[in-house]
Amino acid sequence: MAQDDQEINYFVRVHNTDLDGTKPVLISLTGIKGVGRHTAKFIAETAGVEKNVLMGKLDEASVDRIREVVSNYADRIPVWMSNRPKDVYTGVKRHLLGADVTMTVDDDINLLKKIRAYRGIRHETGQKVRGQRTKSTGRTGLIVGVKRKKA
């Protein structure tokens, strides 16, 4: 599992992401986009790795088990745990990790713009999307002072 006499690996490569080897496994795994604390705990427990050990002190076999669990994560979890419970195009459950998260969000926003949905129009015009008030907050641009009439 963890070797105390071995030097620490400062960067551990998992799912095309460099993870910090000086942090515990639970915290280090959250460096992957799409992996939070709950997901990291599930990955560590499924891989059989102690979650409080430094990531850089794990031996190669443990890191390989973590890589395997991360790559097959969507197959091991219930629907409510995935970050994409029903894909728009295929209708199947997926859990997106890494660059797939940002690409999919961008694709979803572009789809909303294309079909001229209300949310898509708000995205296009740069306005707030989720129903916030816009009269006094979220102002951008030049600051214009108030001019008073001469008495």
UniProtKB/Swiss-Prot annotation:
Matching SUPFAM superfamilies: S13-like H2TH domain
Keyword entries, A-Z: Ribonucleoprotein, Ribosomal protein, RNA-binding, rRNA-binding
InterPro entries, A to Z: Rbsml_uS13_C, Ribosomal_uS13, Ribosomal_uS13-like_H2TH, Ribosomal_uS13_archaeal, Ribosomal_uS13_CS
Matching PANTHER family: 30S RIBOSOMAL PROTEIN S13/40S RIBOSOMAL PROTEIN S18, SMALL RIBOSOMAL SUBUNIT PROTEIN US13
Stored NCBIfam families: PRK04053.1 (NF003140), uS13_arch (TIGR03629)
Job of this protein: Located at the top of the head of the 30S subunit, it contacts several helices of the 16S rRNA. In the 70S ribosome it contacts the 23S rRNA (bridge B1a) and protein L5 of the 50S subunit (bridge B1b), connecting the 2 subunits; these bridges are implicated in subunit movement.
Subunit structure: Part of the 30S ribosomal subunit. Forms a loose heterodimer with protein S19. Forms two bridges to the 50S subunit in the 70S ribosome.
Name of protein: Small ribosomal subunit protein uS13
Organism expressing this protein natively: Methanospirillum hungatei JF-1 (strain ATCC 27890 / DSM 864 / NBRC 100397 / JF-1)
Gene designation: rps13
